[in-house]
Amino acid sequence: MSIDSLALEQSVQRLFPNQALDQVLAELLLERAKKNLVKYRTLDRQFQAKYGEEFETWRKTVLDSKPPFQTEQDYFDWEMAVTGIADMQEEIKKLQCLQQQP
């Protein structure tokens, strides 16, 4: 299935008047990265509330034990959230730099 390029271009012009396509793409990617950052931070806060400590401290405890299945699953989910936060922060910086270029 292909996208109707003309219809897409018209939508871009209506929603982002006087912006080049690459500027629009950078803006949309920045918006998505910020949404992802909020999602990962929310997960991180939920796990901090559940376990009463930050990931790195809790991680050492888990790795030194034989955790039950749910704790192990939380480990992977929390690790994904912490990694996602770092990745999204880096991506946001890159995209903001791109937007500042003339």
Predicted regions mapped to residue ranges:
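Amphipathic alpha-helical coiled-coil segments with heptad-repeat character
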Residues: 23, 30, 37, 64, ...
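Accessory terminal regions of nucleic-acid processing enzymes
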Residues: 2
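Short linear motifs at secondary-structure transitions and domain/linker junctions
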Residues: 14, 21-23, 34, 45, ...
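Short, charge-rich amphipathic alpha-helices with coiled-coil/heptad character
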Residues: 5-30
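Hydrophobic alpha-helical segments, principally membrane-spanning helices and signal/leader peptides
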Residues: 7, 21, 37-39, 59-62
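Amphipathic alpha-helical coiled-coil segments
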Residues: 26, 30-40, 44-47, 81-88, ...
